Amino acid sequence: MTPAPTTRTRIKICGLTREEDVDAAVEAGADAVGFVMYETSPRYVTAGRAAELARRLPPFITPVLLFVNAPATQISAACALIPTAFLQFHGDETPEDCLAAGRPFMRAARIPLGEKSAENTPGSPGGFDLVKYAQDFKAAQAILLDAHVEGYGGGGKTFNWSLLPPNVSAHLVLSGGLTPANVIDGISQVRPRCTTLAVDVSSGVEISKGIKSADKINQFVAAVRAADELLAKSPHHVRVPPA
């Protein structure tokens, strides 16, 4: 019997600001690195600086530019400097806004945190309809799941993974409070719910905001690979709570 195909979890290290952190992500085996184009973020870099850092990337590692309600002129100027960039929209952008950039993109979904909310039901955390959201942004290459906190970005918080819908017809990127210690559990809970799964980490591999730890990056990547190996060998370890 031919064994079932396995899926390697793709990894993005986000919020990079330094050459050594880009190099550490590459050496650890990350698939993508993220540069924050949102000026109020402590991890903000200019488009010019992002272009300098992106030039360190070898082939087949993707630079991702994160925007929050940015004007079209800012997006196009950044894309001109980094022609291979993939876009991440993390604000209040509409499907039309995302498509107007004319580049491959993923769209962040802000998942409510409140574990005790009366609106929390299986498949609808905090009343948020992820299935509809994914359909609304069906042109996106992926939907990134982040915790809904004040402002934009997940603030290093995790949401309740067990409340996600059991079947989302989309490529998902799990984000929000991931660390080397919890990413195995996150992958095991979320992967069976979607088409494919990737993970995105920022604060979980930092020394301070915008300053990454090479050791933590290596630990995170190793944990993701351990999750892949565990699920390939023992699919019953994948945990999906009953509906």
Model feature map: region roles:
Residues 1-14, 235-243:
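N-terminal amphipathic alpha-helix/helix-capping segment at the start of soluble metabolic enzymes
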Residues 12-24, 28, 36:
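N-terminal beta1-alpha1 ligand-phosphate binding loop
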Residues 23, 76-77, 184, 218:
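Alpha-helical segments flanking ligand/cofactor-binding loops in enzyme cores
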Residues 28, 81-82, 138, 189-194:
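Structural motif
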Residues 30-42, 88-94, 148-149, 154, ...:
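Glycine-rich phosphate-binding active-site loops on the catalytic face of alpha/beta enzymes
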Residues 36-42, 48-49, 54-182:
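Conserved anion-binding
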Residues 47-57, 98-100, 187, 202, ...:
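C-terminal helical cap(s) of enzyme catalytic domains, especially alpha/beta-barrels
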Residues 173-192, 206:
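A C-terminal functional module that forms or caps the active site or interfaces directly
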